Amino acid sequence: MQQEAAQRESEELQHVQWRPRAVSGWGVPQLLWYLVFLQPIITEVHLRRRNVQFLFIRFSAWQYAGTDKLWAGLVTTLCEGIRRHYGALPFSVYSVLGNKPATRQDCCQSEWHCRRRVCLGLLALLAALGLGVGLLYLSLGGHALGHGSPSGSLLKVFGGAATTLSGSGLLMAVYSVGKHLFVSQRKKIERLVSREKFGSQLGFMCEVKKEVELLTDFLCFLEIYQRRRLRVVLEVTGLDTCYPERVVGVLNAINTLLSDSHAPFIFILVVDPSILAACLESAGNMKGTADNGYLFLNRTVTLPFSVPIMGRRTKLQFLHDAVQSRDDLLYREMTRKPWLPGDAGGESAQLLAVQAQAGTERGQGRIDDEAARRIQEALFCLHDERDCLYEYVPDNVVSMRRIVNTVPITVRLLQQQQQQGDFGGPTPRQAVAWVVLANQWPCRLSWALQCLEDRQQTGGAPEGRARLWDVFRDNSRELHTMTKALQNVLDLDGDPELFERFLGADFPFTVAEAQSLLRCTVNLDHSIRRRMGLIRAVSALKPPSPPKSPTRDTPHAAHRANSASRAPPSGRASGQAGEGHHTGDLAHRGKLWPVACALFRPGQSSPGGP
């Protein structure tokens, strides 16, 4: 935006004779002169100007998340940002002596009009002050010469009155400017918010609206003075971390600021639309207005913009930047200088103690150097263009930093585990891949680990070289029946197809590697596995089957006895026996069919079915 604004201004200045005025440095006295004695006029020339200057102000909602008046924080941040950019003195002078820009209906091209009332009033005050001072001087001079008379007393009275009135007028103006100079709009609004009785009244919003209108008029004055259009861009971040009612308050404040069609404000909401829509729908004071949060956003947002999918180079650059931000973990141990012991004082005991301490430190230094090398290798795999691991990292900077911050801890724990006897453990590349797996698919990974743990407890654990993907695939249908109970946890997972490609092809972790890495995992919530274990244990409990009726079994027994008495020779008997066994097998399958049918949703075919 700044580049576009600079290009527009350069193109505009090639066709006009005027140049923009400065509002800082030596331009401040001229700005104060215009503020006091001249009134701006909105002309056609000003409306045709194409050069724009953007003023960016960032508002982080989480900084004001603890207050009930989050929208008041938005307004105070806006006022404070403009005051800090243009200075407190010009805004204070405009608050006391400034005048709202006017619109002329005639064809006059002059952008400034002399404020005759201000000039005449100031001249009158100065004349009265000079007259009063002169009268006091004459009265005091005559009294000093010894010519005391009633006329001298009269001159003293008139001179004192003129001096007092004119001086008090000037002092009041200076006092008002000084008051606005030290008491900013932010302090005013915060003082109004602290009044609970006043905050619940209609006059509270009226006072805030007046402050915003004053701010808008000041920006319009600066537009005409600088000879360029001004746009204040307010970046609202962290709104998805606030309560729904406070989110609604911020949106109402934005609508209030944008209610004026000529308001020079641009609001950029950096937020997930789904979270914002859910906040609007769950807010109690928006019932009937925002029952559908997306429709409410369509009525409010004038330019929806979704960030496109991050490209390969952009993702690698972000990952590289995230890794470079953790240089303290990479090179802190590598740049350590070996400590050389000094003079031991000649005592053998102290010398042996110092040498033992130095040997211990050298051994610890070698361990730290090896850990730093492994961390560097693991993080390099994360943003290596020739590796496929970066494809599984989400296009979210927060998730990238979470993964980068977790890798050093995991690698150090893995190194400590290998030093204790597990020398053939996973590599640094497998460690960082495991961190990505736990970050992207915590529910599916927890389910595979829970199924593996249950099989170990029942004595049917798979071999160590068996793939973790096979364990998950064999129990995926059971996970499908628990989607309702685990819906919130399943929402944490990423793309299921990427999960299959991750475990099935690119990173085929074995059961032994998974068990080794599980002891070093710090970014996986173990409560998910405990919850899955409880749900699985409850679903395994089956009600006892009802007892068989003896009256039903008697006819079947008699029928079997009659069939046996009428049995043909051996060859035919064997054939009927096989047929009877097949019939019993079908009956047995018929009993199991309702249990198997419960694993599928309506409309889903059974395994092996058509």
Swiss-Prot record:
Domain of life per record: Eukaryota
Keywords associated with the record: Membrane, Transmembrane, Transmembrane helix
Topology with respect to the bilayer: Multi-pass membrane protein
Occurrences of domain KAP NTPase (ranges): 1-414
Transmembrane helix is among the record's keywords: yes
Region (Disordered): 540-587
Biased composition (Low complexity): 560-575
Protein name in the entry: NTPase KAP family P-loop domain-containing protein 1
Organism: Homo sapiens
